[in-house]
């Protein structure tokens, strides 16, 4: 859609975000997990979603690999495609936040500008940047998908951390040590959500 198309207008609906949040008994936010491949983003996000589900929190997890099977299946890994990938995910996450959900996203999202773009789209107070900080050597040793091995062999180009830059967050809402136990990291995230009055259980 062209931004200047005067025939396309925004429709307001009678049920508000606040009413949806009252229905869910918690606030709608996005927790944006970022870090290198193999840092533990998806693992921690999945464990957190499981913990939140047990507490009765309405959640949805958007995973970097999964969205490329559908929503972003037409995109590659050029800088332009990566930016569009994050833009689309940001729009979907924003809709889910407006539905009153706690949205968890697990994406490398290597560039600060793109993460800032999503933050501005979702809005301050509803965007929580989660930096899963795991040393490259540890990520490479884990290499669950064998991607680092391929990148080192020259079989995979533009791989973040090897021949493509990762811009670490400078002021994430929470900075996790990716070498700690997953259970410890989940507890840190639950504590943050409670301290910020996002969940009450």
Swiss-Prot record:
Residues bound to ATP: 35-42
Organism field: Shigella boydii serotype 18 (strain CDC 3083-94 / BS512)
InterPro entries: APS_kinase, P-loop_NTPase
Organism placement in taxonomy: Bacteria, Pseudomonadati, Pseudomonadota, Gammaproteobacteria, Enterobacterales
Catalytic activity: adenosine 5'-phosphosulfate + ATP = 3'-phosphoadenylyl sulfate + ADP + H(+)
EC annotation from Swiss-Prot or TrEMBL: 2.7.1.25
Pathway: Sulfur metabolism; hydrogen sulfide biosynthesis; sulfite from sulfate: step 2/3
Active-site residue numbers: 109 (phosphoserine intermediate)
Protein's recorded name: Adenylyl-sulfate kinase
NCBIfam families per UniProt: apsK (TIGR00455), PRK03846.1 (NF003013)
GO molecular function: adenylylsulfate kinase activity; ATP binding
Role this protein plays: Catalyzes the synthesis of activated sulfate.
UniProtKB keywords: ATP-binding, Kinase, Nucleotide-binding, Phosphoprotein, Transferase
Enzyme class: transferase
CDD domains, alphabetized: APSK
GO biological process: hydrogen sulfide biosynthetic process; sulfate assimilation
Family (UniProt): Belongs to the APS kinase family.
Gene: cysC
């Amino acid at each position: 859609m062209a931004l200047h198309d005067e025939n396309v207008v925004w429709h307001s609906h009678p049920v508000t975000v606040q009413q949806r949040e009252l229905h869910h008994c918690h606030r709608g936010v996005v927790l944006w997990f970022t870090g290198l491949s193999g840092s533990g983003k998806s693992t921690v996000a999945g464990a957190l979603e499981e913990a939140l589900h047990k507490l009765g929190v309405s959640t949805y997890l958007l995973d970097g690999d999964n969205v490329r099977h559908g929503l972003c299946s037409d995109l590659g890994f050029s800088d332009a495609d990566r930016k569009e990938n994050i833009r689309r995910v940001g729009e979907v996450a924003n809709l889910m936040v407006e539905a009153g959900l706690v949205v968890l996203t697990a994406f490398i999202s290597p560039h600060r500008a793109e993460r800032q773009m999503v933050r501005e789209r979702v809005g301050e107070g509803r965007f929580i940047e989660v930096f899963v900080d795991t040393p490259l050597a540890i990520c490479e040793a884990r290499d669950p998908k064998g991607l680092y091995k391929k990148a080192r062999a020259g079989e995979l180009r533009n791989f973040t951390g090897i021949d493509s830059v990762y811009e670490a967050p400078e002021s994430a809402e929470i900075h996790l040590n990716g070498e700690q136990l997953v259970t410890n990291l989940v507890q840190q995230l639950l504590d943050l959500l409670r301290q910020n009055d996002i969940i009450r259980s």
